[in-house]
């Protein structure tokens, strides 16, 4: 393992299995949560370097609620967040604008399902090596005695 820990929050077991296998084959440690509630609990239990969340879960666009909640949390707001969705394929709805603009979505990366393996891995690498991730790592090291 390369030491990087990823939390994957998605309610589709088949999709979760596929993404988990891709990430583990690339030597990432992956913890899975099948609901936002499980995801929040996992974030309280452990430390992660990246969160990947689906937009559509449960009763609707719960992934957006997860993203907003994480970005408002003092401890978790710098944790890189990658949102993946099949919403355009399912509904024809398309997110317009700059994904990094605060009024768009509070995420650091956005991919549409189905996601090509190389595109996913490149985006994960990019987010794990961003300046934001480096800041988070420094903060964690500074907290240790």
Stretches with model-predicted labels:
Residues 12-18, 117:
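Short acidic/polar segment at the start of the alpha1 helix of CheY-like receiver
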Residues 47-49, 74-80:
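His-Asp phosphorelay/catalytic-motif detector in bacterial-type signaling
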Residues 47-53, 57:
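Active-site beta3 strand of CheY-like receiver
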Residues 122-140:
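The C-terminal output helix
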């Amino acid at each position: 393992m390369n030491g990087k820990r990823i939390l994957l929050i998605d309610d589709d077991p088949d999709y979760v299995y596929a993404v988990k296998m891709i990430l583990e084959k690339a030597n990432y440690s992956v913890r899975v949560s099948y609901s936002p509630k499980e995801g929040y609990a996992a974030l309280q239990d452990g430390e992660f370097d990246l969160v990947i969340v689906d937009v559509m879960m449960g009763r609707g666009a719960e992934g957006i609620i997860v993203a907003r909640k994480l970005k408002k949390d003092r401890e978790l707001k710098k944790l890189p967040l990658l949102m993946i969705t099949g919403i355009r394929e399912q509904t024809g709805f398309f997110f317009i604008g700059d994904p990094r603009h605060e009024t768009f979505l509070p995420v650091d990366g956005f991919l549409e399902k189905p996601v090509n393996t190389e595109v996913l891995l490149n985006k994960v690498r990019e987010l794990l090596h961003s300046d934001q991730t480096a800041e988070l790592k420094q903060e964690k090291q500074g907290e240790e005695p």
